[in-house]
Amino acid sequence: MARILIVDDDRDLLDGQQAFLESKGYEVQTAAGMDEGLAKLSGFEPDLILADLMMEHYDTGFVFCKKVRELPGLKNVPILMQTAAPKEIGFTLDSHSEKARGWMKVDEVLTKPVPLEDLLGKIEQYLSR
């Protein structure tokens, strides 16, 4: 089954999504921040990455995604960004345009909380490409 890396500073979210995705047969690794996430990538090659936007700083997710895209072999790995920014600061991120996806270095932005079945649907959508 596919391998997924989840990078988020919310331990409850990490644990919940990991348990759910593992119950669906996915191999899941988690990281509690950007540095830990980048370190995990040295020994774990995910088929998809779920990354939070606001971790250590408001833009940490963007920095993480940019660094991932610079790593050999990970340029085309789907990255789904999860964020509560629309609810927390009223800032909406639209990943529907090619230009927006280009500067964000993500394939799609999902607004937290993401219902687990919806998350599974998105994961399956991107992994089937």
What label would you give each PLM region?
Residues 8:
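Conserved acidic carboxylate
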Residues 52-53, 83:
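Active-site residues of response regulator receiver
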Residues 11-29, 126:
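Two-component/phosphorelay signaling modules centered on CheY-like receiver
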Residues 39, 62-75, 98:
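Short amphipathic alpha-helix used as the core "switch/output" element in two-component signaling
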Residues 30-48:
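Acidic, metal-coordinating helix/loop segments flanking the phosphotransfer/catalytic sites
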Residues 45-47, 73-78:
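His-Asp phosphorelay/catalytic-motif detector in bacterial-type signaling
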Residues 115-129:
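Receiver (REC) domain switch/output surface
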Residues 59-63, 85-110, 117, 121:
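Alpha4 helix (beta4-alpha4-beta5 surface) of REC/receiver domains from two-component response regulators
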